[in-house]
C-alpha cells in the first residue's frame, strides 16, 4: 500500500 503496490495491506 505504501509503495502503491497492490494488493499490499495499508497497515
Swiss-Prot record:
Its main location: secreted. GO terms for biological process: neuropeptide signaling pathway; translation. It comes from the Eukaryota. Disulfide bonds: none annotated. The modification Valine amide is found at residue 11. Belongs to the periviscerokinin family. Mediates visceral muscle contractile activity (myotropic activity). This is Periviscerokinin-3. It comes from Nauphoeta cinerea (Cinereous cockroach).
